[in-house]
Amino acid sequence: MFEREEQPDLCRSAKAGLIEYRTVQLLHREGIAPSILDFAVENHRCEFRTPDESVVLEYAALTGGRPHYIYPQHQLVRRLCETLTNAGGHIRFGHTVHAVRQDHGGVVLSMDGPGGDRTEIECDVAVGCEGSSSPVARAMTGIRVSEQTLPVRWLVFLGAAPPLVNHTIYAAHPRGSAQQLRRGPDKTRYYLEIPITDTTADWPEQRVRQELAARLGAGGRLDDVPLVEFGLLDMRVRVTEPMQQDRLFLAGDAAHLITPAGGKGMNLAIQDAVELAHGLIEHFGPKHEDQRLLAYSQTRLPHIWRAQAFSNWLLHLITSLQDGREPADAAPGAGR
């Protein structure tokens, strides 16, 4: 495994943090969750707020006791890295792959190491899991990329304090949406919808506090909460079809990009990885069977399109994109 970031940076960058019930069940079936993961913090409900009313959706109760689990992505990545290396696996941190080519029945990766030394690695297959700029994706020909940029921008930041309530809040407001997402007992992720042309410079901390409190209906409860790690998030969606070509494969953000609405991205990536791992094991293991590996794209794409449609529907519901109607084109290819 080659990772472009150094391990300390990779394992402290706070990103996603909501893991679906079915993803946890999948990790349990794979024998991963019991040994390294403690899914003790659960999220059973979400709340939709407007200036006039509030509706709490008890989705766990409505689905037979199936909650989400709060597990910050950087902590999950750190535990998975530790487990892999403890089992004898190798991760080369600080290695940037800049070119990929298929050659003589294999794959050649050209990369730069931590010291800037360029080297080439030959392998049987290559799996690109490195995001939208994936060199593995660039090396694939004849693929179709469906993508869309939505006119929505979120200001993203962390609050170094417990959440207002112990569940997710989606607030729809005439000036834009706001969201509260739990990230642990003393950290909370906030999203604040801002004009598409604004930057962080347009939003000093006092303005952020006032607007967040107004949209969430928080009164003065956020006045003394330290706010850190500010950033911008534009809403882009993308799906690559197929997710494989010969000895090249894509998983996670290298294959598809989804809006943060609904917390689907990390879950899709985990589900991709498990399905692809099974295909590779059956191909290279004692079975020497190719059926599952060849069907990887066909297996995963329906789930990806369905998640895209849901995420974009939710985005339209809570943001300024909402116009009172369910969007007919909530996601590229949503009618599939």
Indicate residue ranges for each PLM-predicted region.
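General small-molecule cofactor/ligand-binding pocket signal
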Residues: H90-R92
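A conserved FAD-binding loop/helix module that cradles the flavin
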Residues: P260-D272
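Generic enzyme active-site microenvironment
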Residues: M1-F2, G128, A171, A251
